[in-house]
């Protein structure tokens, strides 16, 4: 463990730091939510994380350490994949079938076996604070989406394939690395089935195109459309 931590601060570890530290900072912000707080506090924390992580990402410039020349048509494919994942994410809870919605939320949303109480959710703080809602939309689409792609597809999937991951041609990953990354990404989200589908799609994009840009585009499109869905339909449970 000490050796692993030491490598993050080594002079030659700039690529690892650039691809991982913004994500670690984002996750660290979750610790604050374990302390007693009111419904507005998580929205304020999210806004602060958005600003701080954006600054750190710009400072570390992770895009210098991943291929940025996707295959022909990769960006367009990323857009369509992003739209498809948004539909798969939102559709089960948008169908006019209460029984389907209840089953989905009870078993395919954390924690399985219980129904999430969105009526009392802190998410509705965004309906009272438009500025925080806009920051949430921008942060989820243009900050956390690139940060997650840099960490999961830019670093983790490659590091699990080969510890000297920087010498590994982008897109050449083992099945073990691919599926472990999908699993970790899935359980980072409350809607873990949607997270698994998204993780598979974004990972496949990165592997197929040999570039991280397509998966970033897909993730940005998904999160932006989901944010619009939340704001236009008052579906704050997604946030």
Question: What are the roles of these predicted feature ranges?
Answer:
Residues 26-34, 83-91, 182-189, 223-229:
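Aromatic-anchored segments of alpha-helical transmembrane domains
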